[in-house]
Amino acid sequence: MKEIVLAGGCFWGVEEYMSRIKGIVETKVGYANGIKENPSYKVVCSGTTGHAEACYIKYDESIISLEELLNKFWNIIDPTVLNKQGNDRGTQYRTGIFYLNEKDLNIITESKSREQKNYKKAIVTEVEPLKCFYEAEEYHQKYLKKNPEGYCHIHLD
């Protein structure tokens, strides 16, 4: 099994979208790469912690490759906009690819370079090693499964 953490705006939609992909074994939403230990949603939303709302993904590489997973990720975000996806604004809504394995960096940077050819503006999606990931509160986990009419900036149909 392999792991990656993806930030694509509000984590509810990213988790729901990713959880529907064949080969995804586990998803969890949380707060990635900030400066405060174990922050709450309220504190992250204040914009003072540096965390991004993100989705931890465990996947079976024999079913879906990292390259294929990233292609699906690029389809659900606007990688040229900083700190905004859909109606959500703030540093916690920035886009990012946070890797746990240094060997994945080449695949990620090649994917980002290929994706850049689709845009005139520069892609601002962060590519960084995962420094920290704090699981979000339970009510955020599988939020759109529990609340199918809940807000989502991603078209899931």
UniProtKB/Swiss-Prot annotation:
<comment type="function">
    <text>Has an important function as a repair enzyme for proteins that have been inactivated by oxidation. Catalyzes the reversible oxidation-reduction of methionine sulfoxide in proteins to methionine.</text>
</comment>
<dbReference type="GO" id="GO:0005737">
    <property type="term" value="C:cytoplasm"/>
</dbReference>
<dbReference type="InterPro" id="IPR050162">
    <property type="entry name" value="MsrA_MetSO_reductase"/>
</dbReference>
<dbReference type="InterPro" id="IPR036509">
    <property type="entry name" value="Met_Sox_Rdtase_MsrA_sf"/>
</dbReference>
<dbReference type="GO" id="GO:0036211">
    <property type="term" value="P:protein modification process"/>
</dbReference>
<comment type="similarity">
    <text>Belongs to the MsrA Met sulfoxide reductase family.</text>
</comment>
<dbReference type="Pfam" id="PF01625">
    <property type="entry name" value="PMSR"/>
</dbReference>
<dbReference type="InterPro" id="IPR002569">
    <property type="entry name" value="Met_Sox_Rdtase_MsrA_dom"/>
</dbReference>
<dbReference type="GO" id="GO:0034599">
    <property type="term" value="P:cellular response to oxidative stress"/>
</dbReference>
<keyword id="KW-0560">Oxidoreductase</keyword>
<feature type="active site">
    <location>
        <position position="10"/>
    </location>
</feature>
<protein>
    <recommendedName>
        <fullName>Peptide methionine sulfoxide reductase MsrA</fullName>
        <ecNumber>1.8.4.11</ecNumber>
    </recommendedName>
</protein>
<dbReference type="GO" id="GO:0008113">
    <property type="term" value="F:peptide-methionine (S)-S-oxide reductase activity"/>
</dbReference>
<dbReference type="GO" id="GO:0036456">
    <property type="term" value="F:L-methionine-(S)-S-oxide reductase activity"/>
</dbReference>
